[in-house]
Amino acid sequence: MEKIVLLFAIVSLVRSDQICIGYHANNSTKQVDTIMEKNVTVTHAQDILEKTHNGKLCSLNGVKPLILRDCSVAGWLLGNPMCDEFLNVPEWSYIVEKDNPVNGLCYPGDFNDYEELKHLLSCTKHFEKIRIIPRDSWPNHEASLGVSSACPYNGRSSFFRNVVWLIKKNNAYPTIKRSYSNTNKEDLLILWGIHHPNDAAEQTKLYQNPTTYVSVGTSTLNQRSIPKIATRPELNGQSGRMEFFWTILKPSDTINFESNGNFIAPEYAYKIVKKGDSAIMKSGLEYGNCNTKCQTPIGAINSSMPLHNIHPLTIGECPKYVKSDRLVLATGLRNTPQRKRKKRGLFGAIAGFIEGGWQGMVDGWYGYHHSNEQGSGYAADKESTQRAIDGITNKVNSIIDKMNTQFEAVGKEFNNLERRIENLNKKMEDGFLDVWTYNAELLVLMENERTLDFHDANVKSLYDKVRLQLKDNARELGNGCFEFYHKCDNECMESIRNGTYNYPQYSEEARLNREEISGVKLESMGIYQILSIYSTVASSLALAIMIAGLSFWMCSNGSLQCRICI
């Protein structure tokens, strides 16, 4: 009879009403890293590192780039005959120059402060070319004979289009004194040059005067250049060299030229009609008939992510460049479907006492599963889920806003005398980049740890909310579930979920069932104790009889000698 009562009690326990606290799980394979763990699978995650580009040069915010193709900036500005397509160019968003363009200074020489001029172009978006000293305004000098085979055009000798190489006329080179006043509202970019002959014979052949100079002055410039006559190896078939200069002439300022030979005079100047953020980008790509907000030398980036690892040099509204291969923010929970056990988390909620996530609960992150005589089902706790979603969304947006500063990094150029500065600049930029990469990676690791612990704490809080309501009307099963000592229908289950559970209403029924179950356990325990004692005594008696019989047999056949001493 006792066994029947015990069996009935066990069956009753199995069939008791239950409510469990759990969390959402899905088929996601997304993984994140935290301070403590690597490759943690989560239900939801957000990638914040852009890794793709389109491999094209695009318009920047609707404005096309100026792609110089085989021409250099110097070849474009001076007017290399092979760069005639760039004699007049529209507004540009940025300038694209190849690493080693073939059409630069066709007549060999140097461009003074060339890197500074390129820096000026990084703040300029449109030039308007204007004539300041017409070619036919040199009656005492030859303005059309200054050509060279080094600058061919259609198989004939030619020269830079925007400057005039002045030669002697009728064996005379009268001293030049010319001025130009900037009456425009915009700054003017003016270029001129000086010719350095190969020997004295070439000097007199071209300019008649053996000793010459070129003097240029403005309100901010005072320059006097003297030709350097020297024997040099040939480049492009020329032993002579040309040196070009530039200056910015402010409105209402005047530039004065004076020379008695070797002067390469300006014919055209560039009016800076629009300033703005631009850049000179080194790239061999062609225009891809596309539009972007961020351009790199290897392709355009169209992304709202705050970071990228595509190329350190960018122009436009760009994410920050980092050296990382992966930066993923956790937004969801640890993805641990049932039948999978994970390590215990900080609060022991998701990865601790709860066995696994529920793929059947799809309308929330945290919630309940109940079972009673009316059936079973899942119900999400939408209030805690919404609070968590809002909190994590705000945090992710805050992180992205902090990182997503409009950022551009354009390469800087240095001349041969500034290599140490260039090396120092590169080391500093690499150092800053390493620090920024480390900070970004550390921030992601820390925030992922906090997010997962935040979810653990929310599940634990939901569990405690139920535990505090039920008190001793149910018992904890240790797996996130509670087993009732009373009947709990769907209305009762709903009251637990919304926090209105009436403890006194069910306490008497729960007490009686609890005492009945405890009594059954005590009675069954007494039966087991009696059986245990009986079994022990019987076993000991049987063992003693066996030992006595063995001893008697051994004594009777002489195997064992028995002596009784008094």
Swiss-Prot record:
The protein's role, per its UniProt record: Binds to sialic acid-containing receptors on the cell surface, bringing about the attachment of the virus particle to the cell. This attachment induces virion internalization of about two third of the virus particles through clathrin-dependent endocytosis and about one third through a clathrin- and caveolin-independent pathway. Plays a major role in the determination of host range restriction and virulence. Class I viral fusion protein. Binds to sialic acid-containing receptors on the cell surface, bringing about the attachment of the virus particle to the cell. This attachment induces virion internalization either through clathrin-dependent endocytosis or through clathrin- and caveolin-independent pathway. Plays a major role in the determination of host range restriction and virulence. Class I viral fusion protein. Responsible for penetration of the virus into the cell cytoplasm by mediating the fusion of the membrane of the endocytosed virus particle with the endosomal membrane.
Which residues carry attached sugars according to the database record?
Answer: 26-27, 39, 302, 498
Which positions are lipidated as S-palmitoyl cysteine?
555, 562, 565
Biological processes, Gene Ontology terms? clathrin-dependent endocytosis of virus by host cell; fusion of virus membrane with host endosome membrane; fusion of virus membrane with host plasma membrane; viral budding from plasma membrane; virion attachment to host cell
**Residue pairs linked by disulfide bridges in the UniProt entry:** 20-481, 58-290, 71-83, 106-151, 294-318, 488-492
Subcellular location per UniProt equals:
Virion membrane; Host apical cell membrane
Secretion signal, residue range per the UniProt entry: 1-16
Per the UniProt record, the site (Cleavage) maps to: 344-345
All ranges on the Cytoplasmic side of the membrane: 551-566
Q: What is this protein called?
A: Hemagglutinin
Q: InterPro entries attached here?
A: Capsid_hemagglutn (IPR008980), Hemagglutn_HA1_a/b_dom_sf (IPR013828), Hemagglutn_influenz_A (IPR000149), Hemagglutn_influenz_A/B (IPR001364)
Mind naming one GO cellular-component term on file for this protein?
Answer: virion membrane
Membrane-spanning intervals of the chain: 530-550
- Report further notes: Major glycoprotein, comprises over 80% of the envelope proteins present in virus particle. The extent of infection into host organism is determined by HA. Influenza viruses bud from the apical surface of polarized epithelial cells (e.g. bronchial epithelial cells) into lumen of lungs and are therefore usually pneumotropic. The reason is that HA is cleaved by tryptase clara which is restricted to lungs. However, HAs of H5 and H7 pantropic avian viruses subtypes can be cleaved by furin and subtilisin-type enzymes, allowing the virus to grow in other organs than lungs.
Instruction: Answer whether the UniProt record assigns the keyword Electron transport to this protein.
Output: no
Q: How does it sit in the membrane?
A: Single-pass type I membrane protein
The record's section on Pfam families has: Hemagglutinin
What highest taxon heads this organism's lineage?
Viruses
Q: Give the quaternary structure.
A: Homotrimer of disulfide-linked HA1-HA2.
Q: Which family does it belong to?
A: Belongs to the influenza viruses hemagglutinin family.
How does the record describe the protein's post-translational processing? Palmitoylated. In natural infection, inactive HA is matured into HA1 and HA2 outside the cell by one or more trypsin-like, arginine-specific endoprotease secreted by the bronchial epithelial cells. One identified protease that may be involved in this process is secreted in lungs by club cells.
Q: Which UniProt keywords apply?
A: Clathrin- and caveolin-independent endocytosis of virus by host, Clathrin-mediated endocytosis of virus by host, Disulfide bond, Fusion of virus membrane with host endosomal membrane, Fusion of virus membrane with host membrane, Glycoprotein, Hemagglutinin, Host cell membrane, Host membrane, Host-virus interaction, Lipoprotein, Membrane, Palmitate, Signal, Transmembrane, Transmembrane helix, Viral attachment to host cell, Viral envelope protein, Viral penetration into host cytoplasm, Virion, Virus endocytosis by host, Virus entry into host cell
